[in-house]
Amino acid sequence: MGRKKIQIQRITDERNRQVTFTKRKFGLMKKAYELSVLCDCEIALIIFNHSNKLFQYASTDMDKVLLKYTEYNEPHESRTNADIIETLRKKGFNGCDSPEPDGDDSIDQSPLMEDKYRKSSEDLDILFKRYGSAVPAPNFAMPVTVPVTNQNALHFSNPGGSLITQSLMTSSLTDPRLLSPPQPSLQRNTVSPGLPQRPASAGAMLGGELNNSNGTCPSPVGNGYISARASPGLLPVSNGNSLGKVIQAKSPPSPNQNSQLGANSRKPDLRVITSQGGKGLMHHLTEEQLEMSVQRLGGVSQATHSLTTPVVSVATPSLLSHHGLPFSAMSTAYNTDYQLTSADLASLSTFSSPGSLSLGNVTAWQHQQQQQQQHNQPQQLIPVSLSNLVSSSHLPHTATLTVNTNPINISIKREPASPNRERSTGTPLSCFSHQSRHEATGRSPVDSLSSNASSFEGNDREDPRGDYTSSLGLLRPSGDTESESQSVKRMRLDAWVT
């Protein structure tokens, strides 16, 4: 790459003239030095600038060179500007233009440096041709190192269509140097055998993805990872087990897995299971999975669409109502004899807000429950405090809701405290404020009753809080007349302020 040509004429700009003088003066002295060394000669330069300032250069000593000059009387070569211009014309140069030199003229334009630059450019071109265009395709397989306890159950799927092979996954997992602790912001779904499986992500439960029977959920993110915000199942639980669980849609857990739920396994990461077009989702979930799913309902819902599996709660402790924060506390255990059906879920969808809880909705729901249970066992009536569903400012202490239920031996436990989180208002799940703490004392056994809509076993429950007490009271047998039951229910529901 050549240097630009400049016109050889007087520079009018003072600053440019000074810069050019400094550069070319040093270049001239450098050329004189090279000539004196290469050819073993004595050189003296005497320069006066436009302001009559003297600059001189001598290869040895200026006085000695000047003395030899004054004493020399032999004919010699003497040139002026006109002679130089004439010589340049004869050699083919224009005489009016010259390359713009710089201070390091000889170093920059030496053949050695040009060869070095040319070789470096060729090496860079080879590297760019070899690696420059190697852009990874969208559908590529990459080894993923995640800490797991069961290598046979891992089979990740890429939305692009490529699958990670089992041998590649096994080789990556067996190398102890590749295993790293799970990060809170970016993790894979892992499977832990022997533990109850829970939904790994609210986004991974959508549509036809429930038909996977290999125990995994496809990743909703393009690169195969699931962020911690979109995958609540990957957050570590309080008992130290940081492995996330994935749901198995069509294979319910065995009874021994149900019995392994310890009383100290509290789930601080509560989420909502959402489904778009997932018909009959509750049919594939057993009671234990419903328990774990419902316990995760205290956090903010990650989806903005309506839920197709609404569940109503009749058992919530009034521990956090003084903050004025509504959260959904669902009944967290179900017996296998009283699994909810799609008709139950359709009727439960009316319990979306306190304003939509009317007498007709409750009567329709109770009538449907009576039709399903009239051929099994005698019915019993349990009065449940409505102050657990709505705030105390809308309902007297003595107002109760009569719920038809079917168990014979009822074991009522206390509901553990849920995290202090808010629910989004766009979901039809029950989001009711809890009553204040001062109402827990001085109430009748009817008001302090906190029961679930279906019976559950005591070994599947978590440890209750020590500062909260609940009592069972006023269990009336089903031998009472139907008219008395209806009149009592209407009288109690009249106090419900909607």
Swiss-Prot record:
Residues 173-215, 243-267, 411-498 are annotated as: Disordered. One of its GO terms (molecular function) is RNA polymerase II cis-regulatory region sequence-specific DNA binding. Residues 412-424 have a biased composition (Basic and acidic residues). Residues 1-100 are annotated as: Interaction with hdac9. SMART domains: MADS. The keyword Endoplasmic reticulum does not apply. Residues 3-57 form the MADS-box domain. Residues 58-86 bind DNA. One of its GO terms (cellular component) is nucleus. Restricted to the somitic mesoderm of early embryos and to the body muscle (myotomes) of the tadpole. Expressed in all tissues examined in the adult. The keyword Flavoprotein does not apply. May regulate muscle-specific transcription in the embryo and may regulate transcription of a variety of cell types in the adult. It binds to the sequence 5'-CTA[TA]4TAR-3'. Belongs to the MEF2 family. Binds DNA as a multimer, probably as a dimer. Interacts with hdac9. This is Myocyte-specific enhancer factor 2D homolog. It comes from Xenopus laevis (African clawed frog).
